[in-house]
């Protein structure tokens, strides 16, 4: 009976992989290529990310997105932002000369319950967006977007149920920073702007404890998380969640399950060519993190064999690869996983640029050196700086700028609407500056 079950499971897995449609874009050595011709392609375009419920835009409307989130409307509380992504948006994106989007598929929104399934409403929206991009040949990175780890720690990305498993005794408690991170003043949460609004007031921190939208409802979170302070990511509750995710065990299994389900959902959508496993992961456990990337990549490949899958370092920074020149890119990564990277045919290195190193051209050189070391392409999947844009153009490096729209209507800039009943998305953790027509001439 056991052998029969094993055979049935194996057959089902093989059938799923065989049923997946070929991707629009694939990887060949250190390049992205068009699957139909094998021609190298540089992918460019915007981020399309919704950080709160319903976590994806609706495919509706007939005009392309234009945000109004300037200082004047913020002061008046009458800003406007987009809630849709439609044919007019695709046409506009193509008119700008772009050929891809980085689409947020936030774990907290895609899988709000600890179960072997994705949320039906999330799937409905996802399929509608990917049907649209399939019809138009617009390449899509599926970005497990998060900032400063988890809702339970005033960040976003990792779902509340996961934090409850990782650190149940810290849910709804004042945020604290443990060793060794508390020794670095700039990332100690007590030094984060807005922390003093609640400080150690346990009653205030306990409000909405355990709610999936804690990060948008609790006043202590709201006092700190409109910008994107690193102090939130290195708190004890968020580091417990990261450890639970990257170390071997049930937390890593949960993360891999999420990506297996996401890959299965995208199997019939050839435009969904890539999976970015986690936006800006906040952990110094590099070896365990790369082993987790490997486990997730293998699960994705079992569903969609030619889907490109990201590797990334802490915060997706462009600084760590300075190790390449002296130590090789695999420092702190197991020999087995380093070998797996070099022997792969579907991995790419995802990175961001927000001013480190100070010279964006040096950042690009760092990334190209890492790509050469591992024989993988690199992709700058987030940035705002025109210097980085132009450096990538000069080096034929793919990029996705932050961002097409804020895709949010929460907080005072939008009149303090009731979350989540009257709002869309989440205006937090670096939400402003949406620009559907960004240029860097």
Describe the predicted segments one by one.
Residues 1-19:
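Cleavable N-terminal signal peptides of Sec/SRP-targeted secreted and luminal proteins
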Residues 82, 240-397:
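Extracellular glycoside hydrolase catalytic/binding regions
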């Amino acid at each position: 009976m056991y052998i029969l079950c094993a055979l049935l499971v194996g057959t089902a897995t093989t059938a799923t992989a065989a049923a997946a449609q070929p991707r629009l874009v694939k990887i060949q050595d250190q390049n992205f290529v068009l699957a139909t011709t094998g021609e190298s392609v540089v992918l460019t375009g915007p981020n399309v990310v919704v950080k709160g419920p319903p976590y994806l835009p609706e495919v509706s409307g007939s005009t392309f997105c234009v945000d109004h989130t300037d200082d004047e409307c913020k002061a008046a509380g009458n800003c406007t932002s987009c809630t849709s992504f439609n044919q007019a948006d695709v046409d506009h994106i193509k008119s700008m000369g772009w050929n891809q989007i980085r689409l947020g598929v936030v774990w907290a929104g895609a899988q709000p319950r600890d179960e072997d399934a994705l949320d039906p409403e999330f799937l409905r929206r996802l399929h509608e967006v990917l049907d649209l991009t399939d019809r138009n040949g617009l390449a899509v990175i599926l970005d497990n977007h998060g900032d400063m780890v988890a809702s339970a720690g005033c960040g976003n990305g990792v779902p509340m149920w996961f934090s409850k498993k990782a650190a149940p005794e810290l849910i709804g408690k004042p945020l604290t920073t443990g060793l060794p991170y508390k020794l670095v003043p700039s990332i100690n949460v007590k030094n984060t702007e807005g922390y003093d609004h609640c400080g150690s007031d346990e009653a205030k921190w306990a409000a909405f404890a355990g709610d999936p939208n804690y990060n948008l409802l609790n006043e202590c979170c709201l006092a700190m998380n409109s910008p994107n302070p690193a102090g939130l990511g290195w708190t004890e509750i968020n580091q417990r969640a990261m450890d639970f995710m990257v170390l071997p065990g049930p937390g890593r299994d949960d993360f891999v399950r999420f990506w297996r389900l996401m890959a299965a959902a995208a199997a019939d959508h050839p435009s969904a060519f890539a999976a970015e496993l986690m936006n800006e992961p906040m952990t110094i456990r590099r070896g365990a993190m790369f082993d987790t990337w490997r486990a997730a990549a293998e699960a994705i490949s079992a569903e969609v064999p030619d889907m490109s899958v990201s590797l990334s370092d802490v915060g997706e920074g462009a600084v760590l690869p300075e190790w390449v020149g002296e130590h090789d890119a695999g420092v702190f990564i197991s020999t087995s996983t380093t070998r797996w990277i070099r022997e792969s045919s579907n991995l790419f290195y995802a990175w961001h640029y927000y001013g480190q190193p100070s010279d964006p051209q040096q950042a690009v050189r760092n990334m190209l050196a890492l790509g050469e070391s591992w024989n993988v392409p690199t992709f700058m999947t987030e940035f705002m700086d025109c210097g980085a844009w132009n450096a990538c153009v000069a080096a034929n490096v793919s990029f996705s700028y932050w961002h097409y729209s804020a895709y949010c209507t929460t907080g005072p800039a939008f009149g303090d609407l009731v979350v989540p009943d009257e709002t869309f998305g989440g205006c937090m953790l670096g939400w402003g500056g949406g620009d559907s027509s960004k240029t860097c001439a």
